């Protein structure tokens, strides 16, 4: 399966485990099930790496340490020292979305991000989180992010800012869903039109696209948090 589409190589690996029957109605929850599968895989990898930590890193430890250091340096260079406390969250968002994106490349699995429900939930979490960060940091003064520098501009600025903030989860969710879903459809078409071995090189292109979509979501989340931490105009 791939985003609800028949997978070109295998049927769903966990056929029958991604749906339940309630009152005679079949309710599918592939996106939830495969999100849990992704979390389980990431937790398992983290647990194995934690047990094998050494003072002289090698192999996977070296790779993951380099990746985390790169992400941390990027966040701190963009947000300043205030951003260091958000490294676990932002790095987790990137790795989690990247992992869910990659599941669409594995025969028999779905990419949860090819389902709009998943991306909407992620985007709504970002909306609530960065506004909560702003409220905690600036208390009631955070409202000035929405009203502008002058009280005379409130009737104009407030509705514009509200619409602007509400459009962020819409943009985040539709961008991620549309790109991943589109890639899943194109991948199915490639496998239909050509032999399996002949289409394997296209996986590199899909891998790049899925990486970029996770990075874009991560970047925008970081900038939204950074904006909430900035001093509001009075």
Swiss-Prot record:
InterPro entries: ATP_syn_F0_a_bact/chloroplast, ATP_synth_F0_asu, ATP_synth_F0_asu_AS, F0_ATP_A_sf. PROSITE patterns: ATPASE_A (PS00449). Pfam families: ATP-synt_A. GO terms for cellular component: plasma membrane; proton-transporting ATP synthase complex. It comes from the Bacteria. Its main location: membrane. One of its GO terms (molecular function) is proton-transporting ATP synthase activity, rotational mechanism. The chain crosses the membrane at residues 29-49, 86-106, 116-136, 188-208, 212-232. GO terms for biological process: proton motive force-driven plasma membrane ATP synthesis. F-type ATPases have 2 components, CF(1) - the catalytic core - and CF(0) - the membrane proton channel. CF(1) has five subunits: alpha(3), beta(3), gamma(1), delta(1), epsilon(1). CF(0) has three main subunits: a(1), b(2) and c(9-12). The alpha and beta chains form an alternating ring which encloses part of the gamma chain. CF(1) is attached to CF(0) by a central stalk formed by the gamma and epsilon chains, while a peripheral stalk is formed by the delta and b chains. Belongs to the ATPase A chain family. Key component of the proton channel; it plays a direct role in the translocation of protons across the membrane. This is ATP synthase subunit a. It comes from Desulfovibrio desulfuricans (strain ATCC 27774 / DSM 6949 / MB). The lineage of its organism: Bacteria, Pseudomonadati, Thermodesulfobacteriota, Desulfovibrionia, Desulfovibrionales. The gene is atpB.
């Amino acid at each position: 399966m791939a985003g609800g589409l028949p997978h070109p190589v295998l049927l769903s690996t966990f056929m029958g485990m991604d749906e339940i029957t309630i009152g005679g109605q079949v309710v599918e929850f592939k996106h939830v099930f495969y999100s849990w599968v992704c979390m389980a895989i990431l937790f398992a990898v983290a647990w194995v790496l934690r047990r094998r930590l050494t003072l002289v890193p090698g192999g996977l430890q070296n790779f993951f340490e380099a990746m985390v250091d790169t992400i941390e340096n990027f966040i701190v260079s963009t947000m300043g020292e205030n951003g260091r406390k958000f490294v676990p969250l932002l790095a987790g968002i990137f790795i989690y979305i990247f992992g869910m994106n990659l599941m669409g490349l594995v025969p028999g699995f779905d990419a949860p991000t090819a389902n709009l429900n998943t991306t909407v939930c992620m985007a709504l979490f970002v909306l609530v989180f960065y506004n909560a960060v702003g409220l905690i940091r600036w208390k009631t003064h955070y409202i000035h992010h929405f009203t502008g520098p002058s009280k005379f501009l409130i009737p104009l600025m407030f509705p514009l800012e509200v619409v602007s903030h509400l459009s962020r989860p819409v943009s985040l969710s539709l961008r991620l869903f549309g790109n991943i879903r589109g890639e899943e459809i194109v991948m199915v078409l490639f496998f239909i039109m050509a032999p399996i071995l002949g289409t394997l090189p296209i996986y590199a292109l899909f891998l790049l696209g899925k990486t970029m979509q996770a990075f874009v979501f991560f970047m925008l989340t970081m900038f939204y948090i950074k904006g909430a931490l900035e001093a509001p105009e009075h």
